């Protein structure tokens, strides 16, 4: 039996709308839902195998994208949010009642500071950018996945057109490297 990657992948990837303007994300509580409003589509939406991201029950991967911080606002029941791990680089704000991570924010100096991490599957609106790649794929082994079955996982991602990486996609890794080079004076700030 095939392991569950993520419902947005296992059930077939639905192409997003490049003109999509955003929408609301809701926690899983039956009432008094935490609501987060996004004023734009996400970018770099991807399957993530890290151990920190929120995943649907039984899924090996999360699907997470980013939006500019100024395009995210908590619009209902924000008092239910708490930071899951205050020592983590990405401060994941989760609902105290249902446990769903509503958004992750970086508050320290980091290449992705200013971008908030979100799970668009928490929206009831269609049009969000579809997953673009799978990152931190080998990390599922650290969570107990059988390493002998990794080729099956990678093959399933490739079958739906997603490249797999054991970090992030090359453009995102280039962004991190360029940030570090600028910070260390090795690259002009204008580049």
Curated annotation (Swiss-Prot):
The record's section on Pfam families has: GFA (PF04828)
What is the protein name given in its UniProt record? Putative glutathione-dependent formaldehyde-activating enzyme
Q: Where does Zn(2+) 1 bind?
A: 27, 29, 95, 98
Q: What does this protein do?
A: Catalyzes the condensation of formaldehyde and glutathione to S-hydroxymethylglutathione.
Q: Which co-factors does it depend on?
A: Zn(2+)
Question: Keywords in UniProt for this one?
Answer: Lyase, Metal-binding, Zinc
User: What chemistry does it catalyse, as a reaction equation?
Assistant: S-(hydroxymethyl)glutathione = glutathione + formaldehyde
Per the record's keyword annotation, is Chaperone included, yes or no? no
Give the Gene Ontology MF terms in alphabetical order.
S-(hydroxymethyl)glutathione synthase activity; zinc ion binding
Could you tell me which PANTHER family the record lists for this protein? CENP-V_GFA DOMAIN-CONTAINING PROTEIN-RELATED (PTHR33337:SF40), GFA DOMAIN-CONTAINING PROTEIN (PTHR33337)
* Similarity comment text for this entry: Belongs to the Gfa family.
The UniProt entry's GO biological process terms, in alphabetical order, are: formaldehyde catabolic process
Q: Which domain of life is it from?
A: Eukaryota
- Summarize where Zn(2+) 2 binds, as residue positions: 48, 50, 53
